[in-house]
C-alpha cells in the first residue's frame, strides 16, 4: 500500500518517488538524492519502519514519517491491500502531509493539521 501511495503522490506531482531499496543498498545516485536536503516524506508500511532504517543508513532522517499501521492498516501476506482503505488513508493523511511539506495552498495546510483532507484531488484514485 505504501508503494501505491508513493506512486499516487508522484503521478499527482505532489512528491517525487524515490527507490528506498536503492538508498538502503547504498546506490550512490539515490543516496545523493536522499541527502540533497529536499523535504522527505517517509511512508513506512508497518512498525518495523524499514524506510526509516534505510534513510538512517544513509545519514538522513525524514521530515515527516507516516507509519501506515498507525492508521489501522494491517500487513497482508499473499493478498492485495484494501483499495478503499488505501484511498481513505491517502486522502486523510498522506496527500496532506506531502503537500504541507511542499508549502501547499492554505486549504491543504489546514487539512494536514486537522487530518480532514478534501477529497477532490484523490477521486481519480478510487477503484
Protein language model annotation of sequence segments:
Residues 1-125:
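Iron-sulfur-associated redox domains of electron-transfer enzymes in respiratory
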Amino acid at each position: 500500500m505504501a508503494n501505491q501511495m508513493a506512486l499516487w503522490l508522484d503521478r499527482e506531482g505532489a512528491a517525487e518517488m524515490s527507490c528506498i531499496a536503492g538508498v538502503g543498498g547504498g546506490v550512490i545516485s539515490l543516496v545523493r538524492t536522499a541527502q540533497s536536503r529536499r523535504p522527505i516524506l517517509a511512508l513506512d508500511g508497518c512498525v518495523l519502519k524499514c524506510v526509516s532504517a534505510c534513510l538512517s543508513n544513509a545519514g538522513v532522517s525524514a521530515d515527516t514519517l507516516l507509519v501506515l499501521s498507525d492508521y489501522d492498516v494491517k500487513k497482508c501476506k499473499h493478498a492485495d491491500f484494501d483499495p478503499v482503505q488505501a484511498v481513505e488513508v491517502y486522502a486523510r493523511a498522506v496527500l496532506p502531509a506531502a503537500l504541507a511539506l511542499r508549502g501547499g495552498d492554505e486549504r491543504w495546510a489546514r487539512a494536514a493539521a486537522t487530518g480532514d483532507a478534501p477529497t477532490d484531488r484523490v477521486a481519480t484514485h478510487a477503484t
